[in-house]
Amino acid sequence: MSQKFKELINSERPVLIDFFATWCGPCKVQSSVLKTVKENVGELARIVKIDVDQFPAIAAEYGVRGVPTLAVFKNGDLLWKES
């Protein structure tokens, strides 16, 4: 997954990563909002969910210490991150 993740964030198209956990209440609320955002942005950007329990190494590599955490990448650069 790590190589696929790196390919994903190296895209010219912006990528919003939603670092979440299945047990996280606020993550569930945020998920419905992100579905609406995804419908509105269409092909302008990608929105991808990463379960921190399934991929803890990726979460750790990008300094995710709590969920939900959102991060925006473009061309491999982290443009914004918020928990």
Regions from the language model: what does each represent?
Residues 66-83:
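Non-catalytic, surface beta->alpha helical segment in thiol-disulfide oxidoreductase systems
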Residues 24-27, 70:
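The canonical Cys-X-X-Cys-His
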Residues 12-13, 20-23, 66:
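Short pre-active-site segment immediately N-terminal to redox-active cysteine/selenocysteine motifs
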Residues 18, 31, 35, 61-62:
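ABC family nucleotide-binding domain
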Residues 52-59:
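Structural microenvironment flanking redox-active thiols in thiol-disulfide oxidoreductases
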Residues 28-42:
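Typically the conserved alpha-helix immediately C-terminal to a functionally engaged Cys/Sec
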Residues 16-17, 47, 70:
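Hydrophobic beta-strand anchors of alpha/beta hydrolase catalytic cores
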Residues 1-14:
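A short beta-strand-turn-helix
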